[in-house]
């Protein structure tokens, strides 16, 4: 059973007297910086010259500096730019200023696990990975709650890296909900597999193909969208709230019977075999190599596929329906 830590296991005082540099001010960077600041931690945000986020961060009461300067003055350097941009930012702005005994933190293990970033052995390396988007990390903190986090130590040069990691997790509110001990390998491989086979790749194809089957059979696209896409959130919310059993208890008996009798016909043994292949490609680095090469080639296949998916009928119909819904209009205000 994996070890769980809560606020009682974390000492926020460990970060007092240390300066934390948050490199990047996107979804996670924004949340981490503000939560740490509100927790009494000395924070500086590191950005590139001319960043659109510079004024925003300053307006929210944060000190901002060029990334290299932020890394130079900090004891803990937190790299929260996108995975594909991390190597360049690390090499140009962080590595020259990462002296012995400093701490380097990641929120995802990709570049460490796949050897794209290799810190010196005299640097502490750890991960705190909130299991939720940045806006949720921030809103939950403001409500006195928190988003669960994963924590791992990759290098412990000074012998107290886990203490610093747990203090950081507490500082962003994660220890209120629970901090699960893991490894860089486990976090990276399970995260990538979950995204590809279930949460993103699996679910989007399931919704899209379900929509296509109904439309090709002559049903109205709007009805197909509601049944195969829109209602997904309603089902997932029930699962998140109380598990699969809670969802099945909440739906009709007819729906539950259909779940049991048809589910295995859709997700077959062949599907499971393919999912195992996907996992193997994550484990042996095939996916990572392909993604790294795609980025080095300026993303031709990725960009083409993104454009194609955006023009799919399910997206066109979905936008039209959302524009008609009062709750959707309200959420955009």
From Swiss-Prot:
Catalyses which reaction(s): (2R)-2,3-dihydroxy-3-methylbutanoate + NADP(+) = (2S)-2-acetolactate + NADPH + H(+); (2R,3R)-2,3-dihydroxy-3-methylpentanoate + NADP(+) = (S)-2-ethyl-2-hydroxy-3-oxobutanoate + NADPH + H(+)
Residue ranges of domain KARI C-terminal knotted in the record: 183-328
Entry superkingdom: Bacteria
Co-factor note (free text): Binds 2 magnesium ions per subunit.
Annotated residues for binding of Mg(2+) 2: 191, 227, 231
Stated role: Involved in the biosynthesis of branched-chain amino acids (BCAA). Catalyzes an alkyl-migration followed by a ketol-acid reduction of (S)-2-acetolactate (S2AL) to yield (R)-2,3-dihydroxy-isovalerate. In the isomerase reaction, S2AL is rearranged via a Mg-dependent methyl migration to produce 3-hydroxy-3-methyl-2-ketobutyrate (HMKB). In the reductase reaction, this 2-ketoacid undergoes a metal-dependent reduction by NADPH to yield (R)-2,3-dihydroxy-isovalerate.
The protein's name in its UniProt record: Ketol-acid reductoisomerase (NADP(+))
Organism: Alkaliphilus metalliredigens (strain QYMF)
